[in-house]
Amino acid sequence: VNLAKEIDADLVMASDPDADRVGIACKDDKGEWVLINGNQTCMMYLYYILTQYKQLGKIKGNEFCVKTIVTTELIKKIADKNNIEMLDCYTGFKWIAREIRLSEGKKKYIGGGEESYGFLAEDFVRDKDAVSACCLIAEVAAWAKDNGKSLYQLLLDIYVEYGFSKEFTVNVVKPGKSGAEEIKAMMENFRANPPKELGGSKVILSKDYKTLKQTDDKGNVTAIDMPEPSNVLQYFTEDGSKVSVRPSGTEPKIKFYMEVQGEMG
C-alpha cells in the first residue's frame, strides 16, 4: 500500500505464498486506501461476470455459480436478480469443485468463491486460484475505470442496487482438552436451545447441518440437501441477518460468522 501511494496506483493485489488466495486494496471516495474483504471481492467478481455475460448474450439458462454457506447472501441476491442459479456448499474449495464436477455436461459454471479470499472463475482450475483471480480483478478495475468509476465506487453501486451487507467473524479460542469439551458443549447448547431472536430480529429459519434438518419459525422441519453432515449451525432472521456457528477443523476455537443487511440510498 505504501508503494501504491507513492506511484498513485488504482489497485493493490497480494496473494499468499501458494497463490490460492488474493487480497485487494483500493482508494475510497476520499482517496484513502481501504482493504476490500473476501465477500466484497466476490460481489464485484460476480457482478462483473454477469454484466459481461448479459451484454454478450452468453446467458443461455443453464449457468450456475457456487458459494460456501458462510459467504454473504448478497451474492445470491445478485445471481437471483440475473436469473442465475446459486448453489451453496460447505466451507472449503473441494466442495465448490465437487459441484462443478457433478454438473459437467449439464450446466455451465461461471464463477464462485468463499469469504476467506478464495475465488474461481470458469472451470479450467478446480481449486481457488489467485493467478486467475488477480487477472479478473484487474479486468474489473479497468472496466470500472473505463466507465469513470473506481473499484470502490463500483462496490457502492452494487450496494445501492442489491442492498448493503456487512460481514464479520468472531473467533473464540478454547485451548486444550477442556477447551475442546467446552466447544462441544457450546454446540450442544445451541442445538438444544436455538435462539428465537438475534439483534432484536426474529429468527425465521434455523439450519443444523449435522442432522441435515432445517426448522422454520412455524416449527416446520424439512431436509437440507447436502452431501454429508457437518457440525455447523445457521440462523436466519426476519431482517435478513445470518449467523453461522462452527468449530474450527484445525485450531482450538469456535467460529461465529455474522452478516447483517440493509438498504443504501
Positions of predicted regions on the chain:
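A generic beta-sheet turn/junction motif
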Residues: 17, 249-251
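Catalytic or ion-translocation cores adjacent to nucleophile or general acid/base/metal-coordination motifs
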Residues: 36-51
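Short gly/pro/ser/thr-enriched loop/turn and capping motifs at secondary-structure boundaries
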Residues: 21, 42-44, 93-97
